[in-house]
């Protein structure tokens, strides 16, 4: 059963339609997610401007590695209000809206080879609450619909039954397909989500007992519970009509 309300989905999409990609990029070095990748020499040297590189491994910014990082940054912003560090992105692309990146083909980004499972794991999906996971799945659904990868999206859901049970059931571009049930899409506080990620990285990189004790103490504290923040789209402090009108939907 779909637990996403039509009004909250439209408000989320309207916000992303009016938010430039630049807002989803962190200019703080050190926030990029780590992932193991196999770098092809051809991918680097076949780029028109191989000296214009991005990320930490020297791959040209048009390469698949950077596309994955960019999509992860967008989804991180959508679920937590804070993106990752993605340098050397062209100004034109930075000014495109987040919704354009997720739904349109004229951005110059080839998102056809996105690995949903890898992105979800790198964003610590296991520590997201229900509403955060739904926001992530909304982004996946938009990308799958744009790229014609709905079969891959459905396969990912079938391999993750807990996500399939909460996956928003809608057709991008057609709000009539959304069931009108109550859901505020509220999310866990940004500091709490970030603390989850940083603590898990500490545990993974340095298996010290003190880290584990700190993690358990924090996990069992009230900080892990859902808390309000400025990114809750239902109660934006500067909320006005521009966040509830969605063009073309």
UniProtKB/Swiss-Prot annotation:
It is found in: Virion. GO terms for cellular component: viral capsid. Forms the virion spike 'foot' and helps anchor the VP9 spike 'head' protein in the virion. Pfam families: Seadorna_Vp10 (PF07322). This is Structural protein VP10. The lineage of its organism: Viruses, Riboviria, Orthornavirae, Duplornaviricota, Resentoviricetes. The keyword Transit peptide does not apply. InterPro entries: Seadorna_Vp10 (IPR009930).
